[in-house]
């Protein structure tokens, strides 16, 4: 028998994914002058705790290596990311955000948080805290299961 709560979560997750399409983000972003396809690259480089590479960007974005490579190249061309020679292995390069990339990351964070804040505007502080706690735990568990295969 199907669990109605799990089905509701599935529908909500699909709706979130649809709302995060490139076209939807561009329409919402308005004055944020950044190709939404590069949002993921900025996020992936910024979130990496080790040295970011094209491989780590691909993993964080959930895309294959060739797609990540093309997106990283576009981010480099746009001046958002720079390639840096890895001192431990000269054949390898790592990625870091440029000053422009950091500025765009801050603007994107602000933009997203404004959208989320507006969506929760009528919620109590307790509801916001509980939602943040549950969503964070849910995402962590999904990530753990994804890594374990």
Regions found by a protein language model. Name each.
Residues 1-36:
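N-terminal leader segment of winged-helix/HTH proteins
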Residues 1-4, 129, 133-149:
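C-terminal regulatory/oligomerization modules of transcriptional regulators
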Residues 18, 43-49, 109, 136:
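Short, locally clustered residues in the helix-turn-helix/winged-helix DNA-binding domain
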Residues 22-64, 78:
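N-terminal helix-turn-helix DNA-binding core of bacterial DNA-binding proteins
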Residues 40-43, 117, 132-133:
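A cross-family signal for key residues in well-ordered alpha-helices
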Residues 73-129:
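Charged, amphipathic alpha-helical coiled-coil/dimerization segments
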